[in-house]
């Protein structure tokens, strides 16, 4: 738990193209400003909701100026701004205005009660890891990207299986025929990797997971690797192969291109209300233990 007022400037970021988001964002901005904080808006958010009276900044300007960013939206909004603010280590507070909300853990109905308490310094902090990836062609890097959730190499919707050659730390692992291969962080283990039968990794676990997508051989199973592993995935066969970084696509892959993935040097601080439990999030989002229960998150 952290205490003590350590924030002066608060940035607000909203989910784009979302009806009904303008009013809660404006209300939140006014209430935070009333408490004596400087409030700034992410530029696209400010323009979309038509708010005036607050500075509208680029993500880079937010990173240089804001002490914390509050994200009102879904997990995708949190992932997007998290990647952009990662080099600045700007802490994020997530308010769920989307559907699933694995990483935007504060309900919109609770934000007016919880946000002032957190801005006063009462919160729980954790660091989330990212992946950095590059595409190498003929020995030269042609593209770089960061990923919060995952790097996914997969076939297009109209092509057949792809053949991928995977190696870890320079050591050959296997050739795999499948619809693709996912490299996921612990945060991303509850995203696409989970729907492909991958394991759930606790966010504080120092690991990454490799998850095949519909492999031809059932013996190709997910594997958890140390988070300092250097993973290389080479395109050996197939056509119209894509690589996605948190679903941001690069579609011009060629045979023998290699996607190199490793843990990023950047981490993103997440701030949670006091009493936050990752297990509560899993239980609610995955509908575990749906029968009536009086159990709480205290150790028995």
Curated annotation (Swiss-Prot):
Required cofactor(s): a divalent metal cation
GO terms, molecular function: ATP binding; metal ion binding; NAD binding; NAD+ kinase activity
Active site: 75
Catalysed reactions, as listed in the record: NAD(+) + ATP = ADP + NADP(+) + H(+)
EC primary class: transferase
PANTHER family, alphabetized: NAD KINASE
Role according to the record: Involved in the regulation of the intracellular balance of NAD and NADP, and is a key enzyme in the biosynthesis of NADP. Catalyzes specifically the phosphorylation on 2'-hydroxyl of the adenosine moiety of NAD to yield NADP.
Family that this chain belongs to: Belongs to the NAD kinase family.
Annotated protein name in UniProt: NAD kinase
Organism (species): Burkholderia cenocepacia (strain HI2424)
């Amino acid at each position: 738990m952290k205490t003590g007022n350590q924030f002066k400037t608060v940035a607000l970021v909203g989910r784009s193209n979302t009806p009904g988001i303008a009013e809660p964002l404006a209300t939140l901005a006014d209430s935070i400003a009333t408490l004596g904080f400087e409030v700034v808006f992410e530029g696209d958010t400010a323009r979309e909701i038509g708010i005036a009276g607050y500075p509208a900044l680029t993500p880079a300007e937010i990173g240089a100026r804001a002490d914390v960013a509050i994200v009102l939206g879904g997990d995708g909004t949190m992932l997007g701004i998290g990647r952009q603010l990662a080099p600045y280590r700007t802490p994020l507070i997530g308010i769920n205005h989307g559907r699933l909300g694995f990483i935007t853990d504060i309900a919109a109905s609770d934000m007016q009660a919880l946000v002032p308490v957190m801005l006063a310094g009462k919160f729980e902090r954790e660091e989330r890891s990212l992946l950095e990836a590059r595409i190498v062609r003929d020995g030269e890097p042609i593209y770089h990207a960061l990923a919060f959730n995952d790097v996914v190499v997969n076939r297009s919707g109209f092509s057949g299986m792809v053949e991928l050659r995977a190696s870890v730390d320079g050591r050959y692992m296997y050739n795999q025929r499948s619809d693709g291969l996912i490299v996921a962080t612990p945060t991303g283990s509850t995203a696409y990797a989970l729907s492909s039968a991958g394991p759930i990794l606790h966010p504080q676990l120092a690991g990454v997971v490799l998850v095949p997508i519909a492999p031809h051989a059932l013996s190709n199973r997910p594997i958890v690797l140390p988070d300092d592993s250097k993973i290389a995935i080479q395109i050996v066969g197939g056509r119209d192969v894509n690589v996605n970084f948190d679903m941001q696509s690069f579609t011009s892959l060629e045979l023998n291109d290699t996607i190199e993935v490793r843990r990023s040097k950047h981490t993103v601080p997440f701030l949670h209300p006091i009493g936050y439990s990752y297990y509560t999030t899993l239980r609610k989002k995955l509908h575990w233990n749906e029968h009536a229960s009086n159990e709480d998150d205290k150790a028995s």
